[in-house]
């Protein structure tokens, strides 16, 4: 019962996180009266140099005063290229050239967009929000453009994917592994393997995921009902061993918690 409740708590927290983030997105990107709007040429004056009015940068169209982190963004500093502009793409690509320091995020994946959103959370927490940048993400009236609406949808999609990944990790925690030139490789399961604390150990199995080139080792519960049939009283008491996406390791006993493969 503790195991089932624990998984339920994890999933409930994940769902709650998505709901809370939806509220944050509305607050960040929705209408806000009296907000300051910057034109690109105006923001370009805020590079932190002598005589400049300040040190600002923009991310996904939101402008932040980064004066408190001046040593990172002032002229000559490592991240000086971000100052006075929206260089959203470079937060993901790491391309700090003039060609890379742009706000064009076309072609980025949902996970990369989610990384941008995580950066946005960082700036929201550590720096002062001062306005919005008119252009790719905000219109002249300060409201989101269709491109920013697409970003919001991708953030939601990325969060849902993370939620699914967390659910999968609770069901099939990654194995512990080690390799040495003297002993070869070893895979094993414990109650903490994969960073997932639980009341069962499990046995190593290959898990094949759709689209993945290679399987990876996961720990599989060997008793009780399948994870997707917790309320079925007529289960075979094999845990998740009968999952069709799993395969035993050749040369390893089916119920061994450790599989060793000498050289």
From Swiss-Prot:
Gene3D superfamilies: Cytochrome b5-like heme/steroid binding domain. Its main location: secreted. It is found in: Secreted. SMART domains: Cyt-b5. Residues 1-22 form the signal peptide. Residues 231-241 have a biased composition (Basic and acidic residues). Expressed in various tissues including brain, heart, adrenal gland, and kidney. In the brain, mainly expressed in pyramidal cells around the CA3 region of Ammon horn in hippocampus. Present in brain (at protein level). GO terms for cellular component: extracellular region. One of its GO terms (molecular function) is heme binding. Keywords: Neurogenesis, Secreted, Signal. GO terms for biological process: neuron differentiation; positive regulation of neuron differentiation. SUPFAM superfamilies: Cytochrome b5-like heme/steroid binding domain. The keyword Zinc does not apply. Residues 220-249 are annotated as: Disordered. Residues 35-134 form the Cytochrome b5 heme-binding domain. PANTHER family: MEMBRANE-ASSOCIATED PROGESTERONE RECEPTOR COMPONENT-RELATED, NEUFERRICIN. Heme-binding protein which promotes neuronal but not astrocyte differentiation. Belongs to the cytochrome b5 family. MAPR subfamily. Non-classical progesterone receptors involved in extranuclear signaling are classified in 2 groups: the class II progestin and adipoQ receptor (PAQR) family (also called mPRs) (PAQR5, PAQR6, PAQR7, PAQR8 and PAQR9) and the b5-like heme/steroid-binding protein family (also called MAPRs) (PGRMC1, PGRMC2, NENF and CYB5D2). The cytochrome b5 heme-binding domain was proven to bind heme, although it lacks the conserved iron-binding His residues at position 73 and 106. This is Neuferricin.
